[in-house]
Amino acid sequence: MEKILYVEFEEGKFKTDTFIVKKETNGTVETIAKDGTKRKFFKSNLEKNKQNYIIEPNDEIKEKEFFLKNKKTEMEKIIEQINDEIKNLN
């Protein structure tokens, strides 16, 4: 079964991408994007850069769960920012 790499990039704004996994080792994940671009991810770099990632079988339910979980995380971050701004006003 085909596996998918889900990556949440934290580059100033919330963005999640998915990649088809072609080869996975202990240290790297070789992928191909939807547009055909090949990419190699080093797992240590993903962890070091605080990027969330999971590798799962290509399953629509898993994909939806991942995106919903990350949307919740995004909302929690926004709520924290609003609460911080309210504290600063007081």
Question: How would you describe each model-predicted region?
Answer:
Residues M1-K13:
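Short coil-to-beta transition motif at edge beta-strands of beta-rich domains
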Residues M1, K23-G27:
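Short, solvent-exposed coil/turn segments at beta-strand boundaries
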Residues E2-I4, F19, E60-E63:
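Generic hydrophobic/packing signal
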Residues K15-K23:
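Short beta-strand-centered aromatic/proline hotspots
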Residues V29-K34:
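SH3/SH3-like beta-barrel fold
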Residues E8-E10, T18, K43:
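Generic structural signal for short, flexible, solvent-exposed coil/loop and linker residues
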